[in-house]
Amino acid sequence: MAGKTFVYVGAEADGLYRKEHNDSQWTKLSKGMPPSPQVRAIAIDPRNSSILFVGTQRGVYRSKDSGESFERMNMDEGRIVWSIKFHPHNPEIMFLGTEGSEVYRSDDAGANWEYVSTIINQDSVQMAFATRILGIGIEPDEPQQMYAALEVGGAAHSSDGGKTWEIVNKEFDGDVDLMDLHGVSVGGPGAKSVFISNRTGVWKSTDRGQNWQDLNFESFSDIRYSRGVETSPNDPNTLYACVGLNFGSEQGGVMRTTDGGDSWTRFDQGVNALSTTFGVAINEHSPEQVYFCTRKGQVFGTLDGGNSWKEHVLPEIAANVKAIACTSG
């Protein structure tokens, strides 16, 4: 399997799929998973690409064999997992975020999970679902500095490794378009900036959320509703952001910046995305390999930094795609 590139996709309908870049078909991965799995988060162990974690409607599951089989990890019952994040320097430490805005931590590589805190924002916008943590960001140089993207509650910052949280919504309070956060990533010069995505595009803070700068996506793209945002593992100034017209639109794409957010260009040139792009994944072993998924189940990948693209057609039953990850095997 050396030298091959594998991509994993998670959907709310029909669970988890895996595909090698050059294969013609996807493999459904369900052994040991809960019935009718709803997969909303995927994280691959940075030390061993055969180990992956998926967040489901019944907690977090781990595979040690590239998804061939799974086992449920030890955590509180009834938790819907929306985000999973490894500590930047110690992969034994992991964090996850749930529906209900709870933060859990593992100190033994994901085997056992302990409740840490609940992020409370009294000004969260009331929706048909409980406020949930769609993304977790961690500063690489000061990993006790953490960030959370709340749908629909804005941004939160922790300075003590997730034990306590401060809502940092100075520019957002009261505006549902700004409070509806979908992703968070740490990057920029020296990896000291935090980027969040919402209905209006991507915003940036250089002072840990005390102030936010609108990066003016409307200057660079005619579609700016943003979902996932990710930093390249080898260059903190390079970030990718998923965009569409709105949640249910029939257009999608990926924006890229190489200067820490000052300017953005369309990365997915020549790609015909027929719904809003929800997730983007960069292969940390080969950062020129980038994949993205759309809400209605299209998956596109490039092995050469966007010069050429290949579409990986998911089975029609895989709908409401929410998560994507890729690695070398």
Question: For each predicted feature, which ranges?
Answer:
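Extracellular glycan-interacting surfaces
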Residues: 1-329
